[in-house]
Amino acid sequence: ADGIKMAVAVGADLWHMNCVSARLCAKFPDFPTAFFIDFSGKGWSNRSMLAKKQKAIAGFIFVDKYGRRYMTEEMKPHAAAYEVGNYDSHKLEFPRIPSWSIFDRRRIENGQVGQISSGPSGPQQLYRWSRDNSAELARGWIVKGDTLAELARQINMQPKQLERTVLTWNACCDTGSDPEFHRNPLELVKLDNPPFFAIKLYPGGSNTLGGPRRNHKSQVLNPFGEAIPSLYAAGECGSVYGLLYPAGGGNLAECIAFGRIAAENAVREAGSK
C-alpha cells in the first residue's frame, strides 16, 4: 500500500488493481489474521499424496452457504478466489462468501486441520494450532454436529440440502467418479463417519497483484505511457502477472528478475546524466 501511494503521488499509472492471488482461508473473529487450512491432511496442495497415487485418508467437500458444491475441491489454490467470488445477479448476493468445508471424524482425527507449514501457524508461530484440534473446537473455529442435520442448523444452512449434497458426494465415491466437478478419483472418500465438522471459509491469502504500471525496463509509467524519470518498480507491487499467479515462488522470481532489470537500467540512466 505504501509503494502504491508513493508511486501515485508522483504521477504513476496503476494496473492489475482488481487482481489477487488468493485461495480459501479461514478467518475467525477473535484472531487478527487468516489461516490456511490443510483440508486433506497431506499439505494444502495434496500433491505428495496424489503423486504417489495413494488414496486420500479423509474426505472433505466445499459448499456454498446454501450447502451446494460448486467446484472441484482439488483446486488451483491461487485461482480459487475467482470461483468463490461468483455473483448471483438474481439474488443480488455472493452465495459462496462465506463457503464451508465439510468433513468428518476421519479428518479431525488425522491431525491438525490448520496448516502448520505457513500462515499464522507456520514458522513465525503467531498461533500454535492444537495437535488434536481440541482448542479450535472449544473456540468455535471448528463447528461440530453429531449428524449432518445438526451441523447444518449450527451453520445456518438448510439440513435437507446439505444432506442431499453429501448423499450425492458419497454416491460419487462409491462409483469412483465425480461427473459434475471431476474431482480426482484418489480424493473420492465418503463422508460417513460421524460426528461431522465444518470450517467457515473466505477468499484470501497470499497477495494482491496491483500497483504502478511498468514497462520492460522496469520503469514506472504515467497514465500516458511515458516513463517517469528515475522511478523503477519490481515484484508484486504492480506485478506483471495480472489475473493469474503462475506458481508457488513466482513472486520471488519476479522480484529477482525485475529487480535486476531495474538496477541495470537505473545505473544506465544515472550514467547518462
Regions found by a protein language model. Give the residues of each.
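Gly/Pro-rich active-site capping loops and adjacent beta-alpha segments
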Residues: 68-113, 117, 227-236, 240-243, ...
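A glycine-rich dinucleotide-binding beta-alpha-beta segment and adjacent secondary-structure elements
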Residues: 161-245
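Phosphate/diphosphate-binding loops
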Residues: 36-86
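Short, small/polar residue-rich loop motifs at catalytic or cofactor-binding pockets
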Residues: 55-57, 206-208, 248
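Helix-rich C-terminal "cap"/substrate-channel and partner-interaction subdomain
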Residues: 90-196, 265, 269
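Short, ordered coil/turn segments that flank beta-strands lining enzyme active or ligand-binding pockets
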Residues: 65-66, 216, 223, 257
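Acidic/polar loop patches that form or flank catalytic/metal-binding clefts of enzymes
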Residues: 10-19, 69-71, 160-163, 273
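Glycine-rich loop(s) and the adjacent beta-strand/alpha-helix scaffold that form part
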Residues: 1-32, 88, 252, 258-261, ...
